[in-house]
Amino acid sequence: MPALACLRRLCRHVSPQAVLFLLFIFCLFSVFISAYYLYGWKRGLEPSADAPEPDCGDPPPVAPSRLLPLKPVQAATPSRTDPLVLVFVESLYSQLGQEVVAILESSRFKYRTEIAPGKGDMPTLTDKGRGRFALIIYENILKYVNLDAWNRELLDKYCVAYGVGIIGFFKANENSLLSAQLKGFPLFLHSNLGLKDCSINPKSPLLYVTRPSEVEKGVLPGEDWTVFQSNHSTYEPVLLAKTRSSESIPHLGADAGLHAALHATVVQDLGLHDGIQRVLFGNNLNFWLHKLVFVDAVAFLTGKRLSLPLDRYILVDIDDIFVGKEGTRMKVEDVKALFDTQNELRAHIPNFTFNLGYSGKFFHTGTNAEDAGDDLLLSYVKEFWWFPHMWSHMQPHLFHNQSVLAEQMALNKKFAVEHGIPTDMGYAVAPHHSGVYPVHVQLYEAWKQVWSIRVTSTEEYPHLKPARYRRGFIHNGIMVLPRQTCGLFTHTIFYNEYPGGSSELDKIINGGELFLTVLLNPISIFMTHLSNYGNDRLGLYTFKHLVRFLHSWTNLRLQTLPPVQLAQKYFQIFSEEKDPLWQDPCEDKRHKDIWSKEKTCDRFPKLLIIGPQKTGTTALYLFLGMHPDLSSNYPSSETFEEIQFFNGHNYHKGIDWYMEFFPIPSNTTSDFYFEKSANYFDSEVAPRRAAALLPKAKVLTILINPADRAYSWYQHQRAHDDPVALKYTFHEVITAGSDASSKLRALQNRCLVPGWYATHIERWLSAYHANQILVLDGKLLRTEPAKVMDMVQKFLGVTNTIDYHKTLAFDPKKGFWCQLLEGGKTKCLGKSKGRKYPEMDLDSRAFLKDYYRDHNIELSKLLYKMGQTLPTWLREDLQNTR
């Protein structure tokens, strides 16, 4: 109690005036604190008239500081997040947002774009305790800074808990404050600056691909740059630059020497302030070094989950050797330069070798000086790699006879043997990439017959542009690799006459499109031409400068491999690309130009009946075939009326094989082909494949009660003597546990899984628009087929409609409707259709009713969303569920 007594004595000696004075001081302090936080919370950028001057000399600014408490940074936990990037954009068409997406797509990183919410809902960030995103990118960092309190806290807590970083861009405009503090951060921004001479901070921890040994001399693009300044140890500069002149930045001070200081244009937040790591850019991605650092930022903030290895494989093809007009070909000095440059490039790319593609027919068809160049080139035959073009440089798709095509190849091979050119490289390129994609079957067969070709390349798969979408595939035992352009074409032979000026070529090389191609692709096959190596030798100029630039600015390890080994490496990296995706050749003009004129897209079906099995698809197939304007496919010797192209191994036989199942169209416009394959419905690959080849097709599916469908499939298997179906009862099949045999589980899946109607229709809706899909009531098709066929005709939009009431008749013996022929006779389906089965046992029906309850509810929601009528069986089932 002595302390209490002392306090009482002290209070007796303190005057009331002193107490009031202390209370006044306390209130002032409280008001000051409250105003600071309230005022700071409501602004994205705070004016900073007396911001501390940046000390931006060498070493770079951002001196360590411990003024603010440090928070531990949560380490990235790859197993807890999906490798998906969430990109917040200003709009779906904003330039910076598209550039960010383009880099992610080029790197084959998965992403999701969202319009940046101001006060809207934040996308769901977690799913069952797992983070949905490994990285957050804001096109406009102020959209993040100014998030409403709820969403900001939600996002920040997610980033801390799951170790997720943020990349943000600040793009100044005419309304931007010249000097401001970023709300809630110990970071100052100085905007609308012109900068020059950019350098890289060698101490930056995020550097991976970027090599910090160079300075990019000269003016940086634009005058709207923002630089960052802070005294907090959480901020580390990544890129630094000088201002163009001290006069242009009065808000940074009037020191005459200030313009020579370095200012951070990209800054890394190490997470010491609030536990979240960030990388902030003071401009967009127009500056090439920003693209390079952006790639490193993505890698660093995701713990290299979203990054490519440093190895880059490069192959330079020189097409049209011996081909070319006089004046465009290589002479003796050009050939020597080619050989010397190859040796020079080997200093940076071990065993680098130019790959020469020849057409022997044109040997010695230039001037005397050019013919001497041909001779010298052949004397160096062992110094280069070689691959065949066509003998006469003809486009293979123009040859419809495989034997004639093979004869042309044999002439080129004879020329090669006579001149000591190796013929076992296993690689070939078709002139203009003709016949590679779209596939010309005769080319692939002739290549294998004459040359034993294993690898080719094309720039046309799946399309020429955008180049970042080019992919590889394997067809008929031949690996097809994506081929890249490098800014050089047959007509670009003089440096000073380069389109747009020589500076355009240098821009492509030094940080431009060619540089980015190597940066973002593990394997690059470049297409050049003979004419690029004569005259000004732009081919040599381009690749010497490219390799030099890559060596100066990156840590990439440049390598090369012969074509076959390169293809094997490619499909080791991108194994998911082995399966091709056949597209409609008539949807791309370039594809149509290199597709045989004997083929027509009118031969493709306009309607697919996709199933599922045991719902009445064969009956619908028969009814459609009765229409005079509708023609079905020819039957298959293996799968009868079904082609089964899009869901299985037949797909790899190609579109020529597929088209053979349909008649050559007549001159009438009413031709309407269709095909029915009931196992397309629940196939995971069929929707995407079908939509690629038949993007405008209509799709029909028939649904019956999934319990009845499952039982019908079981009985179908028993009728075909399936030993598993004969051994087990239906109830045993559908209730089998996870410990059941693989064969029993397989039968169970074929009974149950196709009945997940909503799941499968959703997959088709991801490939086709809802107005291209019609869901038919299988029960109604069985009882009132004419009514259903009226709906189908309207859906298809056929010119001539027929009255199915007059063409269908019920056959009491069969128990279903059949085609009515002259004289009152009927044509019905075969004996395998309309079988009589025992009634399903009550326990099985009860089990399936419960099993499919949620699936049927989802189906009803989906059909409502599609604007389609609920089948009668579904309405009854839902009513009983209630």
Curated annotation (Swiss-Prot):
The active site is at 614 (for sulfotransferase activity). Residues 40-598 are annotated as: Heparan sulfate N-deacetylase 1. Disulfide bonds join 818-828. The keyword Transport does not apply. Changing residue 614 to A: Loss of heparan sulfate-glucosamine N-sulfotransferase activity. It comes from Homo sapiens. Residues 1-17 are cytoplasmic. GO terms for biological process: aorta development; cardiac septum development; cell population proliferation; coronary vasculature development; embryonic neurocranium morphogenesis; embryonic viscerocranium morphogenesis; fibroblast growth factor receptor signaling pathway; forebrain development. Residues 40-882 are lumenal. Residues 1-169 are annotated as: Sufficient for localization to Golgi membrane. The chain crosses the membrane at residues 18-39. The presence of 4 different heparan sulfate N-deacetylase/N-sulfotransferase enzymes in mammals, as well as differences in their enzyme activity suggest that some initiate heparan sulfate modification/sulfation reactions, whereas other later on fill in or extend already modified heparan sulfate sequences. This is Bifunctional heparan sulfate N-deacetylase/N-sulfotransferase 1. InterPro entries: Heparan_SO4_deacetylase_dom, HSNSD_N, NST/OST, P-loop_NTPase, Sulfotransferase_dom. Keywords: Disease variant, Disulfide bond, Glycoprotein, Golgi apparatus, Hydrolase, Inflammatory response, Intellectual disability, Membrane, Multifunctional enzyme, Signal-anchor, Transferase, Transmembrane, Transmembrane helix. Adenosine 3',5'-bisphosphate binds at residues 614-618, 712, 817, 833-837. Widely expressed. Expression is most abundant in heart, liver and pancreas. Residues 599-882 are annotated as: Heparan sulfate N-sulfotransferase 1. The gene is NDST1. It comes from the Eukaryota. Glycans are attached at residues 231, 351, 401, 667. Monomer. GO terms for cellular component: Golgi apparatus; Golgi membrane; trans-Golgi network membrane.
